[in-house]
A protein has these predicted regions:
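Charge-dense, helix-prone N-terminal extensions
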Residues: 1-130
Length: 130
């Protein structure tokens, strides 16, 4: 399925005061980044914002369901992304408010991940001046 270009443009326009929105295509949708931090996915013409333990109650209070995927074998998997409230599609302030929460969740998630093991560095080059 193609990415909803109109929705993508709206997100970029609405969030311009907060930073630059970029994307990475994935399985018929796109992962969205705000200044390099994952904050949402676009899937089937809808925006799903990143959530976490700290923000789940806010999403629940708005009635924003959790993103789920049903596999061919019938298994269902959920991810901690929440359907955007209806006002994010036409009110820049609403888009900004919910995107800020999602970016904060993205930053907390990134901080919790273990850092990758670094590769052993090469021996210093004695001919290279610093």
């Amino acid at each position: 399925m193609a990415i909803d270009e109109g929705l993508l443009e709206w997100v970029k326009e609405a969030l311009e005061p907060l930073g630059a929105v970029s994307l990475r295509k994935m399985m018929g949708g796109a992962t969205l980044y705000l200044d390099g931090t994952v904050f949402a996915i676009l899937h089937e013409g809808e925006i799903w914002f990143k959530a976490d333990e700290e923000t789940n109650a806010l999403w629940d209070a708005e009635g924003c369901e959790r993103f789920s995927v049903t596999f061919k074998d019938g298994r269902v998997d959920t991810m901690n992304y929440r359907r955007g409230p209806t006002d994010v599609y036409d009110e820049p302030e609403a888009m900004q408010r919910w995107a800020r929460l999602a970016v904060e969740a993205g930053l907390r998630g990134a901080a919790k991940r273990k850092p990758r093991k670094s590769r052993p560095s090469a021996e210093p080059n004695p001919n290279h001046s610093t």
